[in-house]
Structures are given as C-alpha cells and as structure tokens.
Amino acid sequence: MTKASASLQDGFLNLLRRENIPATIYLVNGYQLKGYIRGFDNFTVAVEVDGRVQLVYKHALSTITPARPLPVSVSQIMRAGEGQEVEGEE
C-alpha cells in the first residue's frame, strides 16, 4: 500500500471517528455492521455496535459507507490521515 492510499484510509477512518459519524460497514462475507468507528490501526478497526465494541480485521472489510455526507473534500481527508487538522468546507 502506498503512503497516499494509507493516508486516505487513515484520514477517512479518523474523520468518522473524530466526528462521531455513524457508518455501515460491509464485510466480505456479506454481513453488515451499523455503528461508530472507535479506533483503528494497520490491521484492525474497532466498531461500536449497539453499545458494544467489536474488533474487525481490515482484510474482512469490503466497504465503509457513512450515514451522512462527509463535510470535507478528499484532499482534506488525506491531510487528516497525515495528522493535520481539517476544517469543514463552506
């Protein structure tokens, strides 16, 4: 994985976590989790579903869909992945 793709992935997950945006997480086996991203690392994502946190391996993920539109652009998401602060677009 290139640094740019890692930054986009990290920025996307970090934005969902930081802004407490609910998401539907689709797994490769077809199962869906609807909840909140609580944390992540290189290999796993912690998802809170119905008040309980589940640790899901990234290789089991297919798609993550936010419940509402994200308030920022892709370039801002990438900056969030690099640890920079991101402000919403007007």
Curated annotation (Swiss-Prot):
It holds the Pfam family Hfq. One of its GO terms (biological process) is regulation of RNA stability. PANTHER family: RNA-BINDING PROTEIN HFQ. It comes from Symbiobacterium thermophilum (strain DSM 24528 / JCM 14929 / IAM 14863 / T). Homohexamer. The gene is hfq. HAMAP family: Hfq. Residues 10-70 form the Sm domain. InterPro entries: Hfq, LSM_dom_sf, Sm. Keywords: RNA-binding, Stress response. The keyword Phosphoprotein does not apply. SUPFAM superfamilies: Sm-like ribonucleoproteins. Belongs to the Hfq family. RNA chaperone that binds small regulatory RNA (sRNAs) and mRNAs to facilitate mRNA translational regulation in response to envelope stress, environmental stress and changes in metabolite concentrations. Also binds with high specificity to tRNAs. GO terms for molecular function: RNA binding. This is RNA-binding protein Hfq. The keyword Transmembrane does not apply. GO terms for cellular component: cytosol.
